[in-house]
Amino acid sequence: MGMFFNLRSNIKKKAMDNGLSLPISRNGSSNNIKDKRSEHNSNSLKGKYRYQPRSTPSKFQLTVSITSLIIIAVLSLYLFISFLSGMGIGVSTQNGRSLLGSSKSSENYKTIDLEDEEYYDYDFEDIDPEVISKFDDGVQHYLISQFGSEVLTPKDDEKYQRELNMLFDSTVEEYDLSNFEGAPNGLETRDHILLCIPLRNAADVLPLMFKHLMNLTYPHELIDLAFLVSDCSEGDTTLDALIAYSRHLQNGTLSQIFQEIDAVIDSQTKGTDKLYLKYMDEGYINRVHQAFSPPFHENYDKPFRSVQIFQKDFGQVIGQGFSDRHAVKVQGIRRKLMGRARNWLTANALKPYHSWVYWRDADVELCPGSVIQDLMSKNYDVIVPNVWRPLPTFLGTEQPYDLNSWMESQEALALAKTLDEDDVIVEGYAEYPTWRVHLAYIRDAEGDPNEAVDLDGVGGVSILAKAKIFRNGVQFPAFTFENHAETEAFGKMAKKMGYRVGGLPHYTIWHIYEPSDDDLKEIASREREKRRQSE
């Protein structure tokens, strides 16, 4: 199942002029088409809906009508009271997972009209059906009926060529793929980007994810968003919340929604909620707070070129808890399934005009808004930043998170020769001593963020890749490729096909901290000790 959203320029004006309630793409009809409803004059409406005398209702009919009105009134009153008791929240789910603005204030949200031409290029071009229909009886008939002759004046010829091009554009689009190779200065060359985000049981982190998306300083009109929701638990609200957030994102009202949500959450938060925050480094907590506090960049609320939402399951049955996802025995199975999901999303969302593909996890907590152009500027075919995560102070405040970005070692190559063909080497586990150089471990907090190193394997938290490598056959192996799978195998495959794979050791983004079972036990133990000491 796929759902698609896109924004057009001058939405309000065109909607009022044309009587349209939804934007229309080249796959439908043009924004310039006249509303067929306006063609009916008042006389025809009067004829169609001529008054017809009705027979006098019986007492039984009157009784039934009055009873129906009473039932409707009671139900309406019940729904109204229920609405008020829900704190006036327009769209919500239990436990505060998704609160999308109060019904009272949502009417006053400011929306944005868009003028950038990139919102309307390629498959979003304006195609006017009235112009196209002129050619229904052939070009010769068009010339005679429109201009009275097949010999055109320069002015008439200009109009003819313009309308003929619109006819061709309605069915044929020509792409010179050499124009979409991916440039290191993509900001200046206006490179289009496909931004892919896989989601599973992710309702709780969607606000964080969308705030990061809005904070991207790469022009939003050049970014197409593609989400894949898969294998969620029964009762999970990820898909519904994602659709609701996306609509507000494309209306330019999502930041206003988040202000309201944050206020509600703050008023409902209890002292025991996210108890682990008491044990986090205060400096890091302040950095997170500053990252999501105004002022934001001037295009923070600007909608993206398009949003596509896909839902497809791949048979993933592994739990989403930290301990479940990171158990060594499930890593091979899990990564092959994730490889299938990534390949499916790429195949369905990648367009000929995309120059870059940016893969991003939803649960990144801190990341520069300029990350796309920062990675792009290094001109690698595949490039990743360093990924760390914060820790409670009793665990050292921070640690490397993504160990899947590495340089190959002789020890790992020798290890692979001892394994079965279908075995998957997993980094960071004692069962697989590879002795590789990991990008995470060569980080210097004060190092040059522009320094780049060549890599063999890459992690999947944040990957920028040139779109041409996918067109040329590189994929996220959903099978064992040189004893690896998914993103690590993706890096190895890209390198084997002659592409440059690299990473930035001193350019760090931060993953959210997810307490493990052992961490939660330690925090509970410390809390009990505090209570004993205070008694």
Curated annotation (Swiss-Prot):
The chain crosses the membrane at residues 65-81. One of its GO terms (biological process) is cell wall mannoprotein biosynthetic process. GO terms for cellular component: endoplasmic reticulum membrane; mannan polymerase complex. Glycans are attached at residues 215, 251. It is a single-pass type II membrane protein. The keyword Transmembrane helix applies. Its main location: endoplasmic reticulum. Keywords: Endoplasmic reticulum, Glycoprotein, Golgi apparatus, Growth regulation, Membrane, Phosphoprotein, Signal-anchor, Sporulation, Transmembrane, Transmembrane helix. InterPro entries: Mannan_Polymerase_Subunit, Nucleotide-diphossugar_trans. Residues 1-64 are cytoplasmic. It comes from the Eukaryota. Residues 22-48 are annotated as: Disordered. It is found in: Endoplasmic reticulum membrane; Golgi apparatus membrane. The modification Phosphoserine is found at residue 25. Residues 82-535 are lumenal. GO terms for molecular function: alpha-1,6-mannosyltransferase activity. Pfam families: Anp1 (PF03452). Glycosylated. Belongs to the ANP1/MMN9/VAN1 family. Component of the M-Pol I complex which contains MNN9 and VAN1. Involved in regulation of the phosphorylation of a number of proteins, some of which appear to be important in cell growth control. The M-Pol I complex possesses alpha-1,6-mannosyltransferase activity and is probably involved in the elongation of the mannan backbone of N-linked glycans on cell wall and periplasmic proteins. Present with 4750 molecules/cell in log phase SD medium. This is Mannan polymerase I complex VAN1 subunit. It comes from Saccharomyces cerevisiae (strain ATCC 204508 / S288c) (Baker's yeast). The lineage of its organism: Eukaryota, Fungi, Dikarya, Ascomycota, Saccharomycotina.
